[in-house]
Structure formats: C-alpha cells, structure tokens
A protein has these predicted regions:
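Short glycine/serine/threonine-biased micro-segments
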Residues: 130-133, 176, 274
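Glycine-rich, histidine-containing beta strand-loop boundary motifs that form or position
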Residues: 141-144, 178, 229-230, 275
Length: 276
C-alpha cells in the first residue's frame, strides 16, 4: 500500500512537519479534487544544496542565444563525447557547435539507453513517456537533478517580470493545470520553493466532486503560480474563480498572440511563454 502524500518520504526524502501538514490540508479539503497518482522531487540533501548554489549562480548570468557567449557549451559537449554512448562516435575534431549533426525522434526511439551517460547510477534514472506534438510516444530518461534545475530558469524568467519566488506567501506555490478525461495528478512539495506545495491537477469535471469545487478550491488556496499548456489554461480561464496568481507559465505548445491577450485580460499578471 502506498504512503499518503504527506507521509511519502521515498519520493520526498526531506519532507518536514510543515510540508507534511500543508499536503494533508490541501488533500483533505472538502472541495479537493481526486489525486490519482504520486510524485516527488527525489532529491537528497546534498543535491538540494547543489541546486541552491546552481540557482544563485544562474540568476547572475546573462542569457544569450549565441553559442559563443555560453561558456558552458564546450565543457558540456566534451562530457557528451566522452561519456554518452550515442555521441562517442561523433567526430571530435569538429570546432563549431553549429557543425555538429542534429538528432530527431527516430534516434531516440531506436535505443534510448544510448543517451544515458555511462557514469549515472541507473537507480536514479527517471523514465517518462511523452508524445510531443507528433502523437508518437517515446520513453525519455531523465534524472531528479535535471527536473529540479528547470526551477532555476523559471525563477530567472520570473525575476525578469518582477516576480520573486522568495516572496511567495501561499502554502500552495504552484498548480500544474491539466484538462483531460484522464490525467496524471498528484500532491507534492517543492523544496526549491520553500517547501510549499506543488499540485498537478486535472480541471476536467471528472476529477472533482462537483464542477463548482474547482472555483472554490482555487479561491481558497490561492496558488502563487499556475502553469499549463495553452489548451488547459484556456479551459481554466472559463472557471469563474476570483484569485489572481502572481504569474502564468505557458508550456508544451505554441502560445498564440490572441490566446496570450486573453490570458493577460483574464489573469491581470505576467504571462510567461516558456515554449514558443
């Protein structure tokens, strides 16, 4: 039998009493949705310490789309050529980043293990399935640190829009919004957001006791951030909750200008397009 989210020390090794209490409160509310699955950050304390250092460093770095201005690229390429089976056959005499051959989904579908670095312990690998925009599912290997480092770039983008995650006051830091007949949902905490809650919710009525519970749940818990793809966020916009998050993060597919304009009018907060 799986542990309740507020007692899930396997997926959240550093879960403390305050984080546990937050999760129990959010899951046990009368208007709460169905939480069908479980998930967590899986980070050990030394990895959280390293993440904090990485985030502080990244915050002060300039962002550039020019390969020559990103000093991390050459060391990263060197590691790939040395330790990732797929890249070991690449021509190591290539000088420019732009001259390396690209890959596509067919490369990933043939042998995904060829993209796992030799030195990574297999018991820390996360495998997840994604269909992208093609509808053809792929199993992708990842690692808890990879998932966690997204937070550093999200924080940086939020700061560009004058949103400081260190000033969040709600016990619910982030809602990841979905809208599907069947959806992976869970309650977790985010150690890189002061151990505040992170909820993946499905706003399809199937996952709620009553459609009105969706509005009541958001207004009661007041999430600081809401993230989702343009489709799920559009569906969410039609729910008449009054709460205004500090920012909306749009992911996974192109955010059209007209849709962005609708979000800005509806939410009255920065809309961050993390995909287009």
């Amino acid at each position: 039998m799986q542990a309740a989210p507020w007692n899930d020390y396997e997926r959240m090794p550093n879960l403390d009493e305050s984080g546990s209490a937050r999760l129990k409160h959010l899951v046990d509310q009368p208007h709460a949705p169905i939480f069908r699955n479980q998930s967590g950050h899986h980070l050990a304390q030394h990895e959280l310490d390293e993440l904090g250092h990485f985030t502080r460093e990244e915050t002060n770095l300039n962002a550039s789309a020019c390969a020559g201005e990103n000093k991390w690229i050459d060391p990263f390429l060197g590691k790939c050529l040395e330790s990732v089976p797929f890249y070991k056959h690449y021509d190591k005499s290539v000088q420019r980043f732009e001259d390396y051959p690209t890959i596509d989904r067919s490369d990933l579908s043939v042998s995904i293990t060829d993209f796992v670095p030799d030195h990574l312990p297999l018991d820390r690998i996360i495998a997840y399935e994604t269909s992208g925009t093609t509808g053809h599912a792929l199993t992708i290997p990842s690692h808890p640190i990879v998932a966690a480092r997204y937070s550093a770039y999200h924080k940086k983008a939020l700061l560009w829009n004058y949103v400081d995650t260190g000033e969040f006051r709600s016990d619910l830091a982030v809602i990841l919004a979905g809208f599907q007949e069947s959806c992976f949902t869970y309650a977790s905490v985010s150690p890189y957001l002061n151990n505040k809650a992170l909820l993946k919710l499905n706003f399809h009525p199937n996952d709620w006791g009553s459609p009105d519970d969706r509005e009541l749940y958001i207004d009661l818990n007041k999430p600081d951030l809401i993230s989702g793809d343009p489709i799920s966020l559009s569906e969410l916009s039609m729910i008449p909750f009054r709460h205004r998050p500090k920012a909306i993060l749009s992911t996974s597919m192109t955010l059209l200008k007209a849709v962005r304009d609708d979000f800005e009018s509806r939410y009255k907060c920065p809309i961050l397009d993390l995909y287009s």
